[in-house]
A protein has these predicted regions:
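Active-site-proximal region of nucleotide-activated glycan assembly enzymes
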Residues: 136-195
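Conserved N-terminal ligand/cofactor-binding loop architecture of enzyme catalytic domains
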Residues: 32-109
Length: 199
């Protein structure tokens, strides 16, 4: 910015919020974060379905495979969850697979939207982007919004610059799983659900 340029002409901070349409929880979290950021008045928010960056095959496996598991074979979901949360090699293989399948499209998405900050509300996106961030293939800060009170080894990533958690009891496990140097709990953060008052 030149010395004669008015501060009001600065470009707003652009935040790219990436979610996944596998369940309303991820989408609702992205919507609440986006609305809160827009309310600041100085933030340009772009919302995307991040799963599309992994390509049709991986997206189908993550989204439709999850729904199939819960409906027809819940034990397979429980088994997979146990593997990814308890066994580091399984997490490493999963992270590598997500990085390989999504890295090129995710980098293309970054070039297109040119964000200053990226926020994710799904662990697959956090994993892929966190790995990219650690390898310096993502140049902007990464924020992971953790909307689950379950095992944080699945939801968090050491490559993320910031983790947002839902409850103060999540601070300690999140710190252990990420190696964070500082933790604090956000209070007075309000979100009003949308509802039809005519019902």
């Amino acid at each position: 910015m030149s010395l004669t340029e008015s501060p009001q002409r600065r470009r707003d901070l652009r935040v790219l919020v990436l979610s996944a349409d596998v369940g309303e929880g991820h989408v609702a979290a992205a919507r609440a974060l986006s609305e809160g950021l827009r309310a600041l008045g100085t933030v340009d928010v772009v919302e995307r379905d991040g799963l599309s960056a992994f390509g049709p095959i991986t997206r189908h496996l993550i989204r439709d495979g999850y729904r199939w598991q819960l409906r027809w074979a819940p034990w397979t979901y429980a088994t997979g969850y146990w593997l990814f949360t308890r066994l580091a090699p399984a997490r490493a293989i999963g992270a590598l697979a997500l990085s390989v399948t999504g890295q090129r499209r995710l980098r293309r998405l970054m070039r297109r939207d040119a964000p200053d900050i990226v926020v994710t509300t799904h662990p697959a996106l956090t994993c892929a982007l966190g790995r990219m961030r650690m390898r310096r293939r993502l140049a902007v800060p990464l924020c992971a919004a953790i909307t689950d009170l379950a095992d944080y080894r699945l939801w968090s990533h050491r490559g993320a610059d910031l983790h947002l958690v839902m409850h103060e009891h999540a601070l300690a496990p999140a710190k252990r799983s990420t190696g964070a140097r500082a933790c604090s709990c956000i209070t007075r953060c309000r979100s009003a659900p949308r509802c039809d008052h005519r019902r």
